[in-house]
From Swiss-Prot:
The gene is trpA. Keywords: Amino-acid biosynthesis, Aromatic amino acid biosynthesis, Lyase, Tryptophan biosynthesis. This is Tryptophan synthase alpha chain. It comes from Thermotoga neapolitana (strain ATCC 49049 / DSM 4359 / NBRC 107923 / NS-E). Pathway: Amino-acid biosynthesis; L-tryptophan biosynthesis; L-tryptophan from chorismate: step 5/5. The active site is at E34 (proton acceptor), D45 (proton acceptor).
Amino acid sequence: MKGFIAYIPAGFPDLETTRKVLLALNDLRITGVEVGVPFSDPVADGPVIQLAHSVALRNGVTMKKILEMLREISVDYELYLMSYLNPIVNYPEGKDRLLDELRRLGVKGLIIPDLPLREVKNIEISFPIVPFVAPNTRDEDLEAINTIRAPFVYYISRYGVTGEREDLPFAEHIKKVKKKIALPLFVGFGISRHEQVRKVWEIADGVIVGSALVRIMEESKRQEIPQKVVARVKELIGEK
Protein backbone atom coordinates (compact mmCIF):
# COMPACT_ATOMS: atom_id res chain seq x y z
CA MET A 1 0.00 0.00 0.00
CA LYS A 2 1.22 3.49 -0.85
CA GLY A 3 0.67 6.61 1.23
CA PHE A 4 -2.63 7.75 2.71
CA ILE A 5 -3.18 10.93 4.71
CA ALA A 6 -6.54 11.72 6.32
CA TYR A 7 -7.75 15.25 6.99
CA ILE A 8 -9.56 15.57 10.33
CA PRO A 9 -10.99 18.99 11.32
CA ALA A 10 -10.17 19.72 14.96
CA GLY A 11 -13.22 20.50 17.07
CA PHE A 12 -15.83 19.02 14.76
CA PRO A 13 -18.19 18.20 16.26
CA ASP A 14 -16.05 18.72 19.40
CA LEU A 15 -12.44 18.27 20.51
CA GLU A 16 -13.15 15.11 22.50
CA THR A 17 -14.50 13.45 19.36
CA THR A 18 -11.44 14.64 17.45
CA ARG A 19 -9.21 13.01 20.07
CA LYS A 20 -11.12 9.73 19.77
CA VAL A 21 -10.92 9.79 15.96
CA LEU A 22 -7.16 10.39 16.01
CA LEU A 23 -6.67 7.47 18.40
CA ALA A 24 -8.97 5.19 16.40
CA LEU A 25 -7.01 5.89 13.20
CA ASN A 26 -3.87 4.62 14.93
CA ASP A 27 -5.12 1.06 14.35
CA LEU A 28 -4.79 1.51 10.57
CA ARG A 29 -1.73 1.40 8.33
CA ILE A 30 -1.91 5.02 7.19
CA THR A 31 0.87 7.51 6.57
CA GLY A 32 -0.54 10.35 8.59
CA VAL A 33 -3.28 12.75 9.58
CA GLU A 34 -3.71 16.44 8.84
CA VAL A 35 -5.28 18.07 11.87
CA GLY A 36 -7.30 21.02 10.57
CA VAL A 37 -7.29 24.29 12.52
CA PRO A 38 -10.64 26.12 12.19
CA PHE A 39 -10.61 29.55 10.57
CA SER A 40 -13.34 32.10 9.88
CA ASP A 41 -12.50 32.52 6.18
CA PRO A 42 -11.38 29.12 4.82
CA VAL A 43 -11.12 30.23 1.19
CA ALA A 44 -9.61 26.96 -0.10
CA ASP A 45 -12.31 24.75 1.38
CA GLY A 46 -15.67 23.65 0.02
CA PRO A 47 -19.00 23.68 1.88
CA VAL A 48 -18.48 20.41 3.78
CA ILE A 49 -15.23 21.52 5.42
CA GLN A 50 -16.44 25.12 5.79
CA LEU A 51 -19.27 23.80 7.95
CA ALA A 52 -16.76 21.93 10.12
CA HIS A 53 -14.78 25.16 10.57
CA SER A 54 -17.95 27.03 11.59
CA VAL A 55 -19.00 24.41 14.14
CA ALA A 56 -15.52 24.28 15.69
CA LEU A 57 -15.32 28.07 15.96
CA ARG A 58 -18.76 28.21 17.59
CA ASN A 59 -17.45 25.64 20.08
CA GLY A 60 -14.63 28.01 20.96
CA VAL A 61 -11.89 25.82 19.48
CA THR A 62 -8.55 27.62 19.20
CA MET A 63 -5.02 26.70 18.21
CA LYS A 64 -4.08 26.55 21.89
CA LYS A 65 -6.89 24.12 22.71
CA ILE A 66 -5.93 21.92 19.76
CA LEU A 67 -2.35 21.70 21.03
CA GLU A 68 -3.62 20.78 24.49
CA MET A 69 -5.66 17.95 22.93
CA LEU A 70 -2.67 16.71 20.92
CA ARG A 71 -0.56 16.54 24.09
CA GLU A 72 -2.99 13.94 25.43
CA ILE A 73 -2.51 11.43 22.62
CA SER A 74 0.25 9.23 21.28
CA VAL A 75 0.03 7.87 17.73
CA ASP A 76 2.32 5.96 15.39
CA TYR A 77 1.38 7.79 12.19
CA GLU A 78 2.75 11.19 11.14
CA LEU A 79 0.94 14.30 12.37
CA TYR A 80 0.59 17.42 10.24
CA LEU A 81 -1.09 20.69 11.14
CA MET A 82 -3.23 22.24 8.42
CA SER A 83 -3.89 25.89 9.17
CA TYR A 84 -4.45 29.12 7.35
CA LEU A 85 -1.67 31.62 7.90
CA ASN A 86 -3.56 33.94 10.26
CA PRO A 87 -3.85 31.54 13.25
CA ILE A 88 -0.13 30.77 12.93
CA VAL A 89 1.28 34.30 12.78
CA ASN A 90 -1.24 35.58 15.36
CA TYR A 91 -0.73 32.84 17.93
CA PRO A 92 -1.19 34.61 21.31
CA GLU A 93 2.20 33.58 22.69
CA GLY A 94 4.02 34.23 19.43
CA LYS A 95 4.72 32.26 16.28
CA ASP A 96 8.06 30.92 17.55
CA ARG A 97 6.44 29.56 20.71
CA LEU A 98 3.87 27.79 18.54
CA LEU A 99 6.56 26.21 16.37
CA ASP A 100 8.48 25.05 19.45
CA GLU A 101 5.32 23.39 20.74
CA LEU A 102 4.71 21.69 17.39
CA ARG A 103 8.24 20.28 17.49
CA ARG A 104 7.69 18.93 20.99
CA LEU A 105 4.49 17.27 19.81
CA GLY A 106 6.33 15.61 16.93
CA VAL A 107 4.35 17.39 14.20
CA LYS A 108 6.10 16.71 10.89
CA GLY A 109 5.01 19.76 8.92
CA LEU A 110 2.67 22.68 8.38
CA ILE A 111 0.15 22.75 5.54
CA ILE A 112 -0.89 26.35 4.83
CA PRO A 113 -3.55 26.61 2.08
CA ASP A 114 -3.30 30.38 1.65
CA LEU A 115 0.49 30.45 1.36
CA PRO A 116 1.49 30.56 -2.34
CA LEU A 117 4.31 28.29 -3.48
CA ARG A 118 6.51 31.28 -4.31
CA GLU A 119 6.22 32.57 -0.75
CA VAL A 120 7.16 29.31 1.00
CA LYS A 121 10.90 30.06 0.80
CA ASN A 122 10.47 33.71 1.84
CA ILE A 123 8.22 33.37 4.86
CA GLU A 124 9.96 33.52 8.23
CA ILE A 125 8.74 30.21 9.60
CA SER A 126 11.52 27.87 10.70
CA PHE A 127 9.46 24.72 10.32
CA PRO A 128 8.87 22.30 7.42
CA ILE A 129 6.08 23.65 5.20
CA VAL A 130 4.32 21.41 2.68
CA PRO A 131 4.27 23.19 -0.71
CA PHE A 132 1.20 23.09 -2.94
CA VAL A 133 1.39 22.29 -6.65
CA ALA A 134 -1.49 22.76 -9.09
CA PRO A 135 -2.06 21.95 -12.78
CA ASN A 136 -1.05 25.53 -13.64
CA THR A 137 2.20 25.57 -11.62
CA ARG A 138 5.08 26.77 -13.79
CA ASP A 139 8.09 24.56 -14.53
CA GLU A 140 10.55 26.93 -12.84
CA ASP A 141 8.48 26.81 -9.66
CA LEU A 142 8.48 23.01 -9.77
CA GLU A 143 12.26 23.00 -9.93
CA ALA A 144 12.43 25.36 -6.96
CA ILE A 145 10.53 22.83 -4.84
CA ASN A 146 13.63 20.66 -4.66
CA THR A 147 15.31 23.37 -2.55
CA ILE A 148 12.50 23.42 0.02
CA ARG A 149 12.72 21.44 3.27
CA ALA A 150 9.41 19.61 3.30
CA PRO A 151 8.06 16.13 4.10
CA PHE A 152 6.09 15.93 0.84
CA VAL A 153 4.45 17.96 -1.93
CA TYR A 154 0.67 18.43 -1.97
CA TYR A 155 -0.77 18.22 -5.50
CA ILE A 156 -4.15 19.95 -5.89
CA SER A 157 -5.92 17.71 -8.40
CA ARG A 158 -8.60 20.24 -9.28
CA TYR A 159 -9.13 23.98 -9.59
CA GLY A 160 -11.13 25.78 -6.92
CA VAL A 161 -12.00 24.57 -3.44
CA THR A 162 -11.92 21.20 -1.70
CA GLY A 163 -14.76 18.74 -2.17
CA GLU A 164 -15.66 15.36 -3.61
CA ARG A 165 -15.72 14.68 -7.34
CA GLU A 166 -16.09 11.69 -9.62
CA ASP A 167 -13.28 12.04 -12.14
CA LEU A 168 -9.52 12.33 -11.70
CA PRO A 169 -8.23 15.03 -14.05
CA PHE A 170 -4.63 16.04 -14.72
CA ALA A 171 -3.18 12.52 -14.53
CA GLU A 172 -0.57 13.33 -17.17
CA HIS A 173 0.46 16.48 -15.35
CA ILE A 174 0.78 14.54 -12.10
CA LYS A 175 3.18 12.16 -13.85
CA LYS A 176 5.17 15.14 -15.17
CA VAL A 177 5.43 16.70 -11.72
CA LYS A 178 6.50 13.38 -10.21
CA LYS A 179 9.46 13.25 -12.59
CA LYS A 180 10.57 16.78 -11.76
CA ILE A 181 10.54 16.70 -7.97
CA ALA A 182 12.59 14.68 -5.49
CA LEU A 183 10.05 14.86 -2.64
CA PRO A 184 7.14 12.41 -2.25
CA LEU A 185 4.04 13.57 -4.15
CA PHE A 186 0.62 13.29 -2.50
CA VAL A 187 -2.56 14.08 -4.42
CA GLY A 188 -5.60 15.63 -2.77
CA PHE A 189 -8.80 17.64 -3.40
CA GLY A 190 -11.72 15.53 -4.58
CA ILE A 191 -10.63 11.97 -3.70
CA SER A 192 -13.66 10.07 -2.42
CA ARG A 193 -13.60 6.49 -3.80
CA HIS A 194 -11.26 3.50 -3.65
CA GLU A 195 -10.99 3.47 -7.45
CA GLN A 196 -9.62 7.02 -7.35
CA VAL A 197 -7.19 6.13 -4.58
CA ARG A 198 -5.93 3.17 -6.60
CA LYS A 199 -5.47 5.32 -9.72
CA VAL A 200 -3.51 7.93 -7.77
CA TRP A 201 -1.30 5.25 -6.22
CA GLU A 202 -0.34 4.17 -9.74
CA ILE A 203 1.16 7.59 -10.58
CA ALA A 204 2.00 9.26 -7.24
CA ASP A 205 3.27 8.42 -3.77
CA GLY A 206 0.01 8.86 -1.90
CA VAL A 207 -3.41 10.44 -1.53
CA ILE A 208 -4.97 12.93 0.86
CA VAL A 209 -8.67 12.60 1.68
CA GLY A 210 -10.66 15.28 3.49
CA SER A 211 -14.22 16.06 2.44
CA ALA A 212 -15.24 12.40 2.11
CA LEU A 213 -14.27 11.81 5.75
CA VAL A 214 -15.78 15.04 7.05
CA ARG A 215 -19.06 14.18 5.32
CA ILE A 216 -19.16 10.85 7.19
CA MET A 217 -18.57 12.74 10.44
CA GLU A 218 -21.37 15.15 9.58
CA GLU A 219 -23.84 12.34 8.82
CA SER A 220 -23.02 10.13 11.84
CA LYS A 221 -24.16 10.17 15.44
CA ARG A 222 -21.46 11.68 17.62
CA GLN A 223 -20.63 8.48 19.49
CA GLU A 224 -20.32 6.56 16.21
CA ILE A 225 -17.98 8.99 14.45
CA PRO A 226 -14.62 7.30 15.31
CA GLN A 227 -15.72 3.86 14.07
CA LYS A 228 -17.44 5.35 11.01
CA VAL A 229 -14.31 7.28 10.02
CA VAL A 230 -12.15 4.17 10.44
CA ALA A 231 -14.59 2.15 8.31
CA ARG A 232 -14.53 4.84 5.59
CA VAL A 233 -10.74 4.92 5.54
CA LYS A 234 -10.61 1.12 5.28
CA GLU A 235 -13.00 1.31 2.35
CA LEU A 236 -10.85 3.95 0.63
CA ILE A 237 -7.58 2.05 1.03
CA GLY A 238 -9.17 -1.30 0.19
CA GLU A 239 -8.60 -2.86 3.60
CA LYS A 240 -11.14 -5.29 5.03
